[in-house]
Amino acid sequence: MAPRWKWKGAEAKALAEPISKSVSELQLSLAETESSGTLSSCNVLLAVEPEQAELLDRCCFGRLVLSAEKIKKWIQLSFEEAFFLHYNLKCIKISLQGRCLENEVDTWLYMKSKRPNFPMFFKAYSHLRSKNWVLRSGLQYGVDFVAYRHHPSLVHSEYSVLVQSGDSDRLRVWSDIHCAVRLSGSVAKTLLTLYVNGNFKGEDVNLLVCLENFTVEEQTISRWSPELSREDQSTNSKQHVPNVSNLNTL
Amino acid sequence: MAPRWKWKGAEAKALAEPVSKTVSELRSSLTQTEALGFLSSCNVLLSVESEEAELLDRCCFGRLVVGAEKDKRWIQLSFEEAFFLFYKLKCIKICLHGRSLENEVDLWRSMSSFKQDFAILYKAYSHLRSKNWIVRSGLQYGVDFVVYRHHPSLVHSEYAVLVQSIGGNDRLKVWSDIHCSVRLTGSVAKSLLVLYVNRKVNTEKMNLPLCLEDYTVEEQTIRRWSPELSREDETRT
């Protein structure tokens, strides 16, 4: 499915301002001011300057929290977003109850204790973010994330992403697969499942090193439609139902 | 959600011809001709006369198999439909490998061995059918069944049904699945109905259709709570 740009000229704008460039700018700016986020039980609150808030919005990290303060802006980050800024981009600090967590392992352990599936989700999040996809929560489509080619103001999201591991609770029965495929199709997205392979149960999960050992397998699932898959149109007529193919575009 | 009739006058037509009446007609007709169904590994093929085929269609049992025969019609029934006609309405016979299955226990065991969750799905199917809902496969909506108030030519289906059982339920375990099902059913103007089939563990009766008596069905609808539509002053009633 081709990307669906929201207005004429949006594609040109996106090409002129690649996400990777905005992220570099953001990284520099946040590192300079030594921004620090406050950890709570389900998210991270980050206090930034107005220009940084604008940069965060351009890169689609977090959501602005409305407040009356003029000089400071508060941004609410999900665990994945905060840890990505902290660990991958190394541009924010994280503090818990007024105490700065110097060691990234401490932050990792805290987030993992609050959300047991955090390691799996973070691996999936950082996997796509590293490829410059913009990720948002997939709450309203019954998936884990939705992925945008560029900023959501320019383009509709292309993939609805389900994060899976060996013992996941999704897509185990046909009715669930039909449900997820039909819903994604009806909002013009492709269902992308990310299988995160790794040992989530063992001691290793406590070490960030394990992130390096985790592998991510990408699969898109789409409905196989006989009318659109006539032999003369596609040479690979031996497709399975549903059509599962490796995602080369990512 | 109110039923969505497909055309003006459809509601009057539905009221004039209740499904229960058509089912009684079908029952006496099939009993008279001793209709015979052939069991395969995933469905039952029933051979009937053309008037009976028309009656089956009006009650929404099975699908017509296109054939060149003029006097005989072939109807493809799902296991649930066939067992309902056989066990509940007692109006068809079923044979396997050319041998008629006189005993309902034999049929029950064959179907259970072909389809693992047959007992649970059949309990849910007969539960709804007994209340004169018309039950069709929910394949295209990612659910087990969809139910209609009357014939699908008159009305849109109102509920998308997921059948759940203790221990065997693989759906709705995580929030993303619930969100997915609720959003999808909402987008096609249906309500999500979850039928929890509770079975008492009774090893003696487990292999018999008699165990159906011990099953209870709990009905639950799930939908999105929308704060704007649930203001205090509006919901006083």
From Swiss-Prot, chain A:
Location (main, coarse): nucleus
GO CC entries: nucleus
Location within or outside the cell: Nucleus
EC category name: lyase
One of the GO biological process terms: mRNA processing
UniProt keyword annotation of Glycoprotein present: no
Source domain of life: Eukaryota
Active site as annotated: Y148, H156, K189
Pfam family, one: tRNA_int_endo
Keyword annotations from UniProtKB, A to Z: Lyase, mRNA processing, Nucleus, tRNA processing
Chain positions covered by the region annotation Disordered: 225-250
EC number: 4.6.1.16
Signal peptide feature range: none
Composition-biased stretches (Polar residues): 234-250
Catalytic activity: pretRNA = a 3'-half-tRNA molecule with a 5'-OH end + a 5'-half-tRNA molecule with a 2',3'-cyclic phosphate end + an intron with a 2',3'-cyclic phosphate and a 5'-hydroxyl terminus
A GO molecular-function descriptor: nucleic acid binding
Coiled-coil intervals: none
Assembly mode: tRNA splicing endonuclease is a heterotetramer composed of SEN2, SEN15, SEN34/LENG5 and SEN54.
Family: Belongs to the tRNA-intron endonuclease family.
Purpose: Constitutes one of the two catalytic subunit of the tRNA-splicing endonuclease complex, a complex responsible for identification and cleavage of the splice sites in pre-tRNA. It cleaves pre-tRNA at the 5'- and 3'-splice sites to release the intron. The products are an intron and two tRNA half-molecules bearing 2',3'-cyclic phosphate and 5'-OH termini. There are no conserved sequences at the splice sites, but the intron is invariably located at the same site in the gene, placing the splice sites an invariant distance from the constant structural features of the tRNA body.
Protein name, entry field: tRNA-splicing endonuclease subunit Sen2-2
Gene: SEN2
Swiss-Prot record, chain B:
Enzyme class: lyase
A single GO molecular function term of this UniProt record: nucleic acid binding
Catalytic activity: pretRNA = a 3'-half-tRNA molecule with a 5'-OH end + a 5'-half-tRNA molecule with a 2',3'-cyclic phosphate end + an intron with a 2',3'-cyclic phosphate and a 5'-hydroxyl terminus
Presence of keyword Nucleus: yes
Active site positions: Y148, H156, K190
Outcome recorded upon mutating R27Q: In strain: cv. Landsberg erecta
Keyword tRNA processing assigned: yes
Subunit structure: tRNA splicing endonuclease is a heterotetramer composed of SEN2, SEN15, SEN34/LENG5 and SEN54.
Role according to the record: Constitutes one of the two catalytic subunit of the tRNA-splicing endonuclease complex, a complex responsible for identification and cleavage of the splice sites in pre-tRNA. It cleaves pre-tRNA at the 5'- and 3'-splice sites to release the intron. The products are an intron and two tRNA half-molecules bearing 2',3'-cyclic phosphate and 5'-OH termini. There are no conserved sequences at the splice sites, but the intron is invariably located at the same site in the gene, placing the splice sites an invariant distance from the constant structural features of the tRNA body.
Annotated family: Belongs to the tRNA-intron endonuclease family.
Database matches in PANTHER family: TRNA-SPLICING ENDONUCLEASE SUBUNIT SEN2
Protein name: tRNA-splicing endonuclease subunit Sen2-1
Gene name in the database record: SEN1
